[in-house]
């Protein structure tokens, strides 16, 4: 089954022809594996409609050489250990971005555009904050041909760095790899800085572990990575309060968590690598767009394109006239 476009919701749903193929295959075969050779996340709610579908494999677009690895996974020669980098919802329209699906042009111009009205609430940041019940397969989800036990040794901070240490043991019958994921939840006040309910902070993958083998992995990140951007302050802000750091198998499945308190509010006005001052960029192109907000989700939920061209956008891609004088070099000349 092949599609080359994703400009509308229908392009991410099964066609009648695809549904007919699935009906036939699942009726004639007792064990079916669905392989998704796709770049975007199609609608997958139909996987639960067929009792004979045993598994689904998300392979992206691996090309001809990559398909050899897919065959090895299907044959059991290689144990899959990938994790979803997207949230798979039951329906396409469950994604706020679907309100802006399409190929839009500003009136009277050839300029195309897409409006990201969902603000920071993209993917799991939206679903885990507002609509967890609409998720079929959560961010970070993935299965293996074996089982792993986790023993969380510590979740700690020295005020500058946050570190989690986890011992992973293969307690199954096949060799395999596992992925330890670490998330954080920052203190939030309604009407304050925009923050999602949970954010990925880091992850680590084990080596290939034989049955019974163990490995201790460490995931660490800067405490300042938990800051939120304040557009009015033009700075990154760490608000005072408890920061919850959790070790998880995916964004939904927590194994252990720790509260890390911050006594005083911190404002980060300079880049910690370059020392350059932090400031807003491109604020003049926002126009009249209403951005999705945690403080009032019903009133700010994306409704579709505004189709108004601001002067800032109109002139954004205009090439400035050269200000220097000189002679244009001769092209195609032959020199002896």
Predicted regions and their residues:
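Short acidic, flexible loop segments centered on an aromatic residue
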Residues: 173-198
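Conserved small/polar residues in nucleotide/adenosyl-binding loops
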Residues: 1-2
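A short helix->loop->beta-strand "cap" motif at the edges of active sites that frequently abuts
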Residues: 27-32, 51-54
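Short, hydrophobic/aromatic beta-strand segments
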Residues: 175-182, 229-232, 257
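Secreted, periplasmic, or luminal enzymes acting at the cell surface/secretory milieu
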Residues: 37, 42-177, 240-248, 261, ...
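Beta-sandwich strand segments
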Residues: 251-259
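Intrinsically disordered, low-complexity Pro/Gly/Ser/Thr-rich segments with frequent PxxP/GP/PP motifs
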Residues: 190-231
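Short, surface-exposed ligand- or partner-binding patches at beta-edge/loop junctions that are enriched
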Residues: 220-251
């Amino acid at each position: 089954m092949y599609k080359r476009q994703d400009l509308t919701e229908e392009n991410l749903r099964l066609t009648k022809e695809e549904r007919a193929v699935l009906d036939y295959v699942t009726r004639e075969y007792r064990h079916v594996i669905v392989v998704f050779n796709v770049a975007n996340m199609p609608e997958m709610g139909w996987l639960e409609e067929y009792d004979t579908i045993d598994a689904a494999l998300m392979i992206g677009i691996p090309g001809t050489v990559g398909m050899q690895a897919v065959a090895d996974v299907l044959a059991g020669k290689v144990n899959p250990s990938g994790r979803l980098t997207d949230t798979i919802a039951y329906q396409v329209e469950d994604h706020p971005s679907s309100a802006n699906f399409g190929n839009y042009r500003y009136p009277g111009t050839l300029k195309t555009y897409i409006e990201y009205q969902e603000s920071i609430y993209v993917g799991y940041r939206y679903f885990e904050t507002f609509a967890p019940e609409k998720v079929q397969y959560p961010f970070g989800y993935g299965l293996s041909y074996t089982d792993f036990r986790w023993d969380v040794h510590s979740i700690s901070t020295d005020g500058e760095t946050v570190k989690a240490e986890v011992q992973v043991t293969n307690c199954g019958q096949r060799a395999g790899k596992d992925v330890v994921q670490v998330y954080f939840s920052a203190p939030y006040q309604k009407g304050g800085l925009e923050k999602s309910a949970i954010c990925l902070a880091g992850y680590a993958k084990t080596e290939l572990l034989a049955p019974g083998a163990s490995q201790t992995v460490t995931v660490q990140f800067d405490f300042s990575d938990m800051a939120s951007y304040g557009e009015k302050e033009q700075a990154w802000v760490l608000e005072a309060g408890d920061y919850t750091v959790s070790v998880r198998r995916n964004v939904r499945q927590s194994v252990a968590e720790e509260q890390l308190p911050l006594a005083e509010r911190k404002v980060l006005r300079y880049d910690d690598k370059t020392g350059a001052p932090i400031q807003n960029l491109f604020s003049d192109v926002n126009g009249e767009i209403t951005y999705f907000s945690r403080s009032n989700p019903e009133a700010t939920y994306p409704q579709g394109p505004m189709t108004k061209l601001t002067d800032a956008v109109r002139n954004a891609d205009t090439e400035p006239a050269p200000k220097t004088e000189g002679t244009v070099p001769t092209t195609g000349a032959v020199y002896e």
